[in-house]
């Protein structure tokens, strides 16, 4: 495994050194969206974590890997409690810390924090949290872990864009990126409804053959969710535009890690236990579970 941090001479201002090249490229207006936490409640998170634990017996699990370093992995995909729960569970199994970017930001939403006003103002004004704050918090957390002897991590909530991925590569060596992909259009059906392409957020009109057979933005056939039309549900154009932008950013991010041969895609299921078994199989950790269930996984 790669070293924990690319921070030579960590004792002397490693945070400033690590962020210096990134800051030059970010620009004054660059910002990161920490919106994954807005789609689900803490109660849902705890419920999903409990289900994930039930599907993965602790007694049969032990840390994997050897040598002086642990896995340095990123999880990405549609926001939702199942992704967070399985990422946290995987970190527990591998005996590495689970680092949630959303949690790091929330911890600074305290009047005692020097960043409180900056973050609170961004949130209250509906703006994005500046990337210098995001990567500052992340680098600080990684340095603290390094100083405590941590040798790996599961990172959730960042990167969200191609540029963030490049900045992250300047700070740490990422070994693997687990991409949780919601099967059967479950994200769109659950959150929005409507005849929506799960890849780009495009609305479909089933009265027109072309729209249901081929998505021009992808150049491939699609099978959108056949539920109520989006217009009936009163979906706002701004919401759909956000989903299209999210899809575009995600595709660029996937391509970035695919070119590095670090991307592993996992089709998630409505049943947390099935998703966990698929994750175990994808990572060749079948010995951690007595009855793994095979799933279609691509590397």
UniProtKB/Swiss-Prot annotation:
GO molecular function terms listed in the Swiss-Prot or TrEMBL record: adenylate kinase activity; ATP binding
Catalysed reaction equations from the record: AMP + ATP = 2 ADP
Broadest EC class assigned to this enzyme: transferase
InterPro entries the record matches: Adenylat/UMP-CMP_kin, Adenylat_kinase_CS, P-loop_NTPase
Residue spans crossing the bilayer: none
Transit peptide start-stop: 1-25
Keyword terms: ATP-binding, Kinase, Mitochondrion, Nucleotide-binding, Transferase, Transit peptide
Residues given in the record as ATP binding sites: 80-85, 190, 203-204
Keyword Nucleotide-binding: yes
Matching PROSITE patterns: ADENYLATE_KINASE
Family annotation (PANTHER family): NUCLEOTIDE KINASE
General function of this protein: Catalyzes the reversible transfer of the terminal phosphate group between ATP and AMP. Plays an important role in cellular energy homeostasis and in adenine nucleotide metabolism.
Secretion signal, residue range per the UniProt entry: none
UniProt subcellular location: Mitochondrion
The protein's name: Probable adenylate kinase 7, mitochondrial
Any Gene Ontology CC annotation: mitochondrion
Positions of the UniProt region annotated as NMP: 100-129
Binding site for AMP: 106, 127-129, 157-160, 164
Ranges where the record places region LID: 193-237
């Amino acid at each position: 495994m790669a070293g924990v941090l690319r921070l030579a001479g960590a004792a002397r201002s490693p945070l400033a050194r690590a962020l210096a090249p990134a800051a030059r490229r970010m620009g004054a207006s660059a910002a990161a969206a920490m919106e994954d936490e807005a789609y689900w409640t803490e109660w849902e998170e705890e419920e999903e974590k409990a289900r994930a634990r039930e599907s993965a017996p602790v007694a049969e699990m032990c840390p994997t890997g050897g040598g002086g370093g642990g896995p340095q992995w990123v999880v990405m995909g549609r926001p939702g409690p199942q992704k967070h729960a399985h990422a946290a569970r995987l970190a527990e199994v591998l005996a590495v810390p689970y680092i949630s970017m959303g949690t790091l930001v929330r911890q600074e939403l305290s009047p005692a924090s020097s960043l409180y006003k900056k973050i609170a103002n961004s949130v209250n004004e509906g703006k994005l949290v500046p990337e210098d704050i995001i990567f500052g918090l992340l680098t600080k957390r990684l340095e603290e872990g390094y100083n405590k002897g941590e040798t790996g991590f599961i990172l959730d909530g960042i990167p969200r864009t191609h540029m963030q991925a490049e900045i992250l590569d300047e700070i740490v060596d990422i070994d693997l990126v687990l991409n949780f992909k919601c099967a059967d259009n479950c994200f769109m059906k659950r959150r929005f409804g409507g005849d929506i392409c799960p890849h780009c957020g495009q609305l479909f009109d089933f009265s027109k053959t072309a729209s249901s057979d081929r998505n021009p933005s992808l150049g491939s056939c699609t099978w959108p969710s056949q539920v109520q039309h989006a217009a009936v549900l009163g979906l706002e154009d701004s919401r759909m535009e956000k989903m299209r932008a999210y899809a575009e950013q995600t595709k660029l991010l996937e391509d970035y890690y695919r070119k590095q041969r670090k991307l592993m895609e996992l089709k998630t299921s409505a049943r947390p236990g099935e998703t966990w078994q698929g994750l175990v199989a994808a990572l060749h950790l079948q010995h951690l579970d007595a009855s793994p269930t095979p799933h279609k996984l691509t590397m």
